């Protein structure tokens, strides 16, 4: 996954992080070796904005009344500790210095502080990455130049002039400029795309090329988790990665999973902004209120490219309309029954099970096929959907005992049937535990 290192994680980042981590868990369960990687976007202009924002907080920590944070800078309180740390380290050495003297230094210190915060935020969700790749380090190592040279050799990058923007009058200062262009029209794009800007800096697309050029060297398959707002660039990056890997004699499958933002509600009303971030509710604030497992499972109750609402009241509601509660309640209900039964589960008399029990067996027995299909499709939400259906089937079986005492799991006058039903229930619980483990969620035994 990736997120700009300019502040704490918010719920849009959260959904992508959970989807990515759950996908990794799913692929590992299916037998793949997986490397979890975080791409640090630390080479763009937003990092300069971060450094300038940190400099404001640095001056504040030195006792200056900075007033309101100017528009265009990051206003959140999360930068106050960064400013205090800078003041402790450098004193007033850069308080009145020219920006050229401190910008690069403050960039480095600020990004390091933000990544420390981001790692801590992700840890709250049980997410730990194996590798962190820095965009700035890739550029310092001339990886973009290597990718460009490779693509030029294959005839996929050339020097050309972009057409004026279509459908509207071009800006007054627009003029045709020769740029290195990737032949993305050969792969279904509507125009060839520049990999460099007119000032010589790499475009986002050019930087992404370099990252994937390196990434593909050590992988048999690549999967990116992107925000849905980047959907327009998927086709061209897929084309570029295909060109890079096929040109190297290795056709590395590459997939991009798009994740929609999350709308936060409380009792149906939009949640106000966070003072800590200045603009959004942070992931840490959400996890602190409702818990890691609720957040993780809820993020997987819809397809990632579908819009999602996260209502603080509903996700902790003890109701069958709350999929998190309904699933955990099924698991806890089974364990409560096992504790109270006074009989050990047994598989010696499974022929005593009737049609209703066998229907539950068939539901649970789908699990291996669901895992295989979900892994093949790279869709961890299928596991969450399956678990919801299994929980509903178990609750239906349980409720049948309320109407007909002969359908209750525990039959005091028939220990053989009780043992068989307990065995069935214990296997349903095991499937629930396994499914939740894939998704990085802990199954509870008491509620």
Stretch-by-stretch model annotation:
Residues 1-447:
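Non-catalytic interaction-recognition regions
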């Amino acid at each position: 996954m990736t997120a700009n290192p300019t502040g704490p994680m918010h719920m849009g980042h959260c959904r992508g992080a959970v989807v990515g981590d759950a996908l990794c868990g799913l692929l590992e369960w299916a037998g793949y070796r997986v490397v979890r990687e975080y791409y640090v976007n630390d080479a763009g202009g937003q990092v300069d904005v971060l450094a300038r924002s940190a400099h404001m907080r640095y001056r504040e920590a030195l006792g200056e009344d900075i007033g309101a944070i100017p528009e265009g800078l990051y206003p959140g309180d999360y930068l106050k500790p960064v400013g205090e740390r800078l003041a402790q380290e450098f004193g007033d050495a850069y308080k009145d210095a020219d920006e050229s003297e401190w910008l690069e230094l403050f960039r480095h210190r600020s990004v390091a502080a933000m990544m420390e915060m981001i790692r801590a935020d992700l840890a709250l969700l049980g997410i730990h990455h194996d590798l962190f790749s820095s965009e700035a380090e890739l550029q310092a190592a001339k990886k973009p130049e290597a990718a460009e040279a490779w693509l030029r050799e294959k005839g996929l990058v050339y020097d050309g002039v972009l057409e004026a923007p279509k459908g509207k009058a071009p800006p007054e200062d627009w003029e045709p400029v020769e740029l290195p262009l990737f032949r993305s029209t050969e792969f279904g794009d509507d125009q060839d795309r520049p990999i460099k800007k007119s000032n010589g800096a790499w475009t986002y697309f050019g930087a992404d090329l370099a990252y994937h050029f390196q990434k593909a060297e050590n992988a048999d398959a690549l999967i990116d988790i992107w925000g849905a707002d980047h959907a327009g660039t998927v086709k061209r990056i897929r084309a570029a990665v295909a060109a890079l890997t096929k040109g190297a004699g290795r056709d590395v499958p590459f997939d991009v999973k798009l994740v929609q933002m999350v709308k936060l509600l409380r009792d149906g009303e939009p949640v106000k902004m966070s003072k800590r971030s200045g603009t959004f509710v942070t992931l840490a604030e959400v996890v602190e209120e409702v818990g890691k497992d609720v957040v993780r499972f809820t993020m997987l109750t819809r397809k990632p490219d579908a819009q999602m609402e996260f209502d603080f009241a509903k996700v902790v509601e003890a109701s069958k309309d709350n999929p998190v509660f309904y699933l955990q309640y099924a698991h806890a209900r089974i364990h409560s029954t096992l504790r109270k039964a006074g009989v050990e589960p047994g598989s010696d008399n499974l022929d005593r099970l009737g049609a209703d029990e066998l229907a539950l067996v068939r539901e649970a027995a789908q699990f291996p096929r669901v895992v295989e299909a979900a892994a093949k499709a790279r869709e961890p939400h299928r596991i969450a959907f399956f678990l919801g259906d299994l929980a509903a089937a178990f609750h239906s079986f349980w409720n049948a005992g309320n109407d007909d005492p002969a359908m209750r799991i525990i039959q005091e006058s028939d220990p053989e049937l009780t043992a068989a039903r307990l065995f069935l229930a214990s296997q349903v619980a095991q499937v629930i535990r396994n499914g939740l483990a894939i998704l990085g969620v802990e199954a509870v035994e008491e509620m």
